[in-house]
Amino acid sequence: GKTRTLTYKIAYELSKIESNKQFVIAITYTNSAAEEIKERVEILGVDPALLWIGTIHSFCLHLILRPYHLYMDNLKYGFTVINSYDTEKILTELCKAYKNPRISYWDCGVIAKPDNIYLTCIDKNKHPSLKKVMKDYYGILENNKQIDFEQILKYSWDLLDRNLIISKSLSKIFSTILIDEYQDTKEIQYYIISRILKANNGNTKTFI
């Protein structure tokens, strides 16, 4: 049902593109959904060369951070994305120092919002210790020129928010943005997409 509808919308929008400088952007909830939709578009006989499809993290990484990281002081000398295994290892080690209250890697969840990155742990008694752990964790990442998944979203928003030229450049090459599973979109993802859409005065079409 829903995937099929999205596939047909993508195929239709691709068939209408007249310039090879414009792209149809489709944002999916998972990488496997992206692969499936791309395959279906090809089965319909439509060339996916002007389709960019992937998750919001992939979108931010490949279309915002990598092309424009020079605009950010802490990213301009390059960066890599830390994997979840290494993140877990670092946080588990850092948590060992805290016994009262005892904290673990599972308490270290965070969520990126437009103004900051926040702890998601519901036990407020653990927050003072967790704040210290996360400060040390982000310090280690900075020393290693690494960023994690939530920072991908936060830094992408910061770049768009501080540099109108980036939103304008992106909006000119995006003819259409389609978003799958829109109800699962976080606030910061909504901000990122909205900023790009606004920069083109509503000329970039969007389907959700």
Label each PLM-derived region with a short phrase.
Residues 1-71:
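P-loop NTPase Walker
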Residues 2, 186-208:
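Conserved helicase motor core of SF1/SF2 NTP-dependent helicases
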Residues 2-5, 23-25, 95-178, 187-192:
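Accessory N-terminal region flanking or inserted into the helicase ATPase core
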Residues 9, 36-41, 59-63, 90-94, ...:
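Alpha-helical scaffold elements adjacent to nucleotide-binding pockets in ATP/GTP-utilizing enzyme cores
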Residues 16-19, 45-46, 169-170, 198-203:
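Conserved catalytic network of the ASCE P-loop NTPase/AAA+ motor domain
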Residues 51, 176-177, 206-208:
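Hydrophobic "anchor" residues on beta-strands that sit immediately upstream
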Residues 67-87, 97-102:
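DNA-processing P-loop NTPase/helicase core
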Residues 181:
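Walker B catalytic acidic pair
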